[in-house]
Amino acid sequence: PRRMEIVSQHDFNASPEPWLLTLSLHENRHVVQTDKLNRGIFRAATYLLGDQGIAPAVGLVPLWFLEGDAVYTETNLSSGGRGRQSSFYQPFRTHLLQHGRSIYPYDKWLMGSYKNARPNHYQFGYMMVGYGYLKYESDIWKSSLEYVTKRPYTLFPFYFSLKKETGLSRKELFQSALHYLDSVWNE
């Protein structure tokens, strides 16, 4: 059994979906993610450290994936969700209209910039996760999480798994996803 306590305030975005439904779908996906990461050495760590024993595993997974996967889930399991709002794609669309295909390096897209508007980790992650599900098998992200729990001793296990599953580096996967979005919007 799992338990989740949600202390919420009203949603600040206009959405047709009830806010608590969207929030519970999103947060429940994080519960599923941590359950998938609670394997191997990290499971042993939870016996010693309680719920905090899984923290190193979560630290090996990029934040964009954790949040993007949760937004992807909330969008797919409801009639609303942020992935269905045009404003959610605005940073990507604006950039592609102004500059064409990415002139900024991957790290600037990922980490943001004080000078240029960039998507946050929810938007960045939703684009990456959604493209991964569209282009590759639905097991791509499951395999990446399993790789983290089986080989946490590698420097970046999540990215090694991504390369193994897709044949692309994280930067190449991002460029491919951005080019796909550009081609869809140009149709």
PLM regions and their residue ranges:
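Solvent-exposed, polar/charged alpha-helical surfaces in well-ordered, non-transmembrane soluble domains
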Residues: 22, 71, 126-130, 134, ...
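Beta/coil-rich, acidic/histidine-enriched accessory regions frequently appended to metallopeptidases
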Residues: 116, 144-187
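Solvent-exposed, acidic/flexible segments
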Residues: 13-25, 59-67, 118-126, 133-134, ...
